[in-house]
């Protein structure tokens, strides 16, 4: 398979949430290395690797320190400190509300990354964050996936389930009938993920 090392597309960041959740079992350094390795599979550009690492470290922090959005952002900032990186500029943009037009350069990893950290910094409700991401246009499903992963880690499943604004969305995902439409193996059902996450009770 040919890999474009110049690509800064969003595919690696879109799929990194499960690894970010699992990183609660790994050290800080191991989590960064895994984030890099996963990006290298399809998106080896250093920008994609660094975006992955920021996102993984933020979710890792939120799992270990639930609700601490400030600490999650600081984890990403501390990781970026040694680098003169465009990802660092994106993170600053996110914190300052400078959100790029998602309909330009559709598929650019910057869009999902910036929106995810912006909504984390502002404490957006999950439903509102997803609504505004979808409303912005562009690569809507992928950007919403990226935003949803980080905001989901921030709010947590119990809080999401208790809110009238987000509970119906969660119910549709958890109780979806996978026998309808284009079927998927039962082992990939969302309920399986909940079982795995529930097992994360001890961290290094």
Residue ranges and their predicted role:
Residues 1-123, 129-136, 150, 154:
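Amphipathic alpha-helical interface segments
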Residues 141:
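Conserved catalytic/binding loops enriched for acidic/polar residues
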Residues 146:
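Short phosphate-coordinating micro-motif centered on Lys-Gly-acidic
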Residues 157-204:
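Conserved glycine-rich phosphate/nucleotide-binding loop
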């Amino acid at each position: 398979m040919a890999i474009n090392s110049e690509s800064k597309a969003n595919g690696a960041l879109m799929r990194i949430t499960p690894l970010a959740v699992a990183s609660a079992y790994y050290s800080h350094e191991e989590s960064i290395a895994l984030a890099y390795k996963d990006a290298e599979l399809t998106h080896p550009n250093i920008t994609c690797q660094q975006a992955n690492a920021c996102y993984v470290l933020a979710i890792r922090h939120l799992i270990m320190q639930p609700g601490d959005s400030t600490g999650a952002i600081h984890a990403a900032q501390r990781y970026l400190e040694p680098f003169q990186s465009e990802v660092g500029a994106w993170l600053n943009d996110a914190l300052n509300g400078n959100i790029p037009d998602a309909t330009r350069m559709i598929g650019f990893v910057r869009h999902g990354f910036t929106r995810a950290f912006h909504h984390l910094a502002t404490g957006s409700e999950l439903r509102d964050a997803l609504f505004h991401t979808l409303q912005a246009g562009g690569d809507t499903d992928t950007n919403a996936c990226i935003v949803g992963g980080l905001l989901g880690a921030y709010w947590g499943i119990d809080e999401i389930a208790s809110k009238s604004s987000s509970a119906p969305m969660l119910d549709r995902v958890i109780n979806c009938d996978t026998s309808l439409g284009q079927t998927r193996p039962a082992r990939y059902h969302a309920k399986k993920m909940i079982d795995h996450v529930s097992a994360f009770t001890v961290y290094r």
